C-alpha cells in the first residue's frame, strides 16, 4: 500500500484540529483543518470511496477480505507469524472453540460499563439494540453455542474475525489458517472517512453540511436523524461527540477527543465513581490515578531517551 493524498490531507487536518484544542488552543488552525476535510469529503463523494452505504455493508468493513477498501489510511496486516493484528488478542477474553480453534487466553480489554450501557440505551420495536454498531463492536453473549458459560464483561469483537462472524456475513472460514494468535489479518484503521466527516461537523457546527455529516452516519447506524432540538449549537456538539464515541469504539481515538476538549478530569471523576460503585475496585481506581497533570502528552520513548544520555528531558508527568 501507499499513502494517498487524501490520507495526508485527513491526517494533517486532524493535527490542525488537535492544535486548535487543549492545551494549545490555536483556534486559527480550525480554518486549515476545515479546508482539508472539505477536500477529502468532496473527493470521497465524487469518487464514491471510503463509504459503506448501509448498516449491513458497514459490518463488512471489519472483515479482512475488505482491507484497503473503506479506510482512508490503515496499518496493513497479513496472515503470518508476527505480521498479524495483535489488537484481536489484546481485546479478547477466553472464548469457546465455536469462535476460533486456537486458545485465546483471556487478555480481555473489555468494554467499559459506561460505553457498554451507552450502546444499549435504545431498542427497536422487536426489543433489539437499535444501533447496529452495538453488536458489530461488542459481544454481549453469556452462553456460548457449545453451552459453555461466559460470566465476564462484554468484549470487543470489531477486529475479531471469528467463525460465527464470518459465516453470518457470508464469508469463508479462515479458522484453519489462524494457527496462533498473531495471525489475524484484519487491518487497523488510522483514519476513516467517518472521522473526517465528524471532525468537519465539529468545526462548522449545525450548518446544513455539518448536519448532513452527522445524519449520514447516524441514519446508517440507527435509522434516525437529528431532531430539531439536537440541531441547536450546544446539543449538536454533544451529538457529534456521541457519534464519535460509538463509531470509533476500540479504534484508539476516544482519548485524543477527551484531551482536545479538555474533558480528562470529568472522565477521571467517572472512574472514581465507578470504582466506589463496585466496592472500591482497585483496578478501576488505578486507571483513574494514571490521569494526572501532564499526561495529555505521551512520554518520550525509553529507547530515544537512551540514544544520547542527557539530550532529552522526560516529560514531567513521567519522571
Which residues are covered by each model-predicted region?
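Charged, low-complexity surface segments at secondary-structure and domain boundaries
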Residues: 101-103, 115-121, 223-228
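Residue-level signal for threonine
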Residues: 4, 110-121, 301
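Intrinsically disordered, low-complexity, compositionally biased regions/tails
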Residues: 88, 110-112, 151, 156
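Acidic/polar-rich alpha-helix caps and helix-coil junctions
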Residues: 1-83, 128-319
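Short, cationic low-complexity segments
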Residues: 91-116
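Short, polar loop/linker segments at the starts of domains and inter-domain junctions
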Residues: 83-96, 273
Amino acid at each position: 500500500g501507499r499513502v494517498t493524498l487524501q490520507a495526508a490531507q485527513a491526517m494533517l487536518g486532524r493535527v490542525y484540529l488537535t492544535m486548535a484544542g487543549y492545551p494549545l488552543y490555536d483556534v486559527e488552525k480550525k480554518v486549515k483543518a476545515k479546508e482539508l476535510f472539505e477536500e477529502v469529503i468532496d473527493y470521497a463523494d465524487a469518487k464514491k470511496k471510503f463509504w459503506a452505504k448501509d448498516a449491513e455493508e458497514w459490518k463488512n468493513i471489519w472483515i479482512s477480505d475488505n482491507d484497503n477498501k473503506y479506510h482512508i489510511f490503515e496499518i496493513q496486516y497479513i496472515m503470518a507469524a508476527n505480521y498479524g493484528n495483535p489488537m484481536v488478542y489484546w481485546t479478547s477474553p477466553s472464548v469457546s472453540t465455536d469462535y476460533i480453534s486456537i486458545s485465546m487466553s483471556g487478555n480481555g480489554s473489555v468494554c467499559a460499563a459506561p460505553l457498554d450501557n451507552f450502546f444499549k440505551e435504545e431498542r427497536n420495536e422487536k426489543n433489539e439494540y437499535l444501533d447496529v454498531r452495538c453488536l458489530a463492536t461488542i459481544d454481549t453473549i453469556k452462553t456460548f453455542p457449545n453451552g459453555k458459560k461466559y460470566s465476564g464483561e462484554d468484549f470487543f469483537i470489531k477486529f475479531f474475525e471469528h467463525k460465527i462472524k464470518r459465516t453470518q456475513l457470508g464469508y469463508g472460514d479462515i479458522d484453519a489458517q489462524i494457527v496462533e494468535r498473531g495471525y489475524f489479518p484484519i487491518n487497523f484503521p488510522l483514519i476513516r472517512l467517518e472521522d473526517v466527516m465528524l471532525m468537519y461537523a465539529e468545526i462548522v457546527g449545525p450548518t446544513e453540511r455539518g448536519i448532513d455529516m452527522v445524519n449520514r452516519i447516524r441514519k446508517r447506524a440507527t435509522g434516525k436523524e437529528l431532531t430539531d432540538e439536537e440541531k441547536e449549537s450546544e446539543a449538536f456538539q454533544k451529538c457529534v461527540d456521541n457519534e464519535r464515541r460509538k463509531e470509533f469504539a476500540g479504534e484508539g481515538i476516544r482519548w485524543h477527543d477527551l484531551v482536545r476538549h479538555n474533558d480528562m478530569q470529568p472522565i477521571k471523576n467517572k472512574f472514581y465513581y465507578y470504582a466506589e460503585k463496585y466496592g472500591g475496585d482497585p483496578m478501576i481506581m488505578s486507571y483513574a490515578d494514571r490521569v494526572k497533570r501532564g499526561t495529555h502528552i505521551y512520554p518520550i520513548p525509553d529507547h530515544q531517551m537512551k540514544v544520547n544520555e542527557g539530550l532529552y528531558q522526560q516529560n514531567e508527568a513521567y519522571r
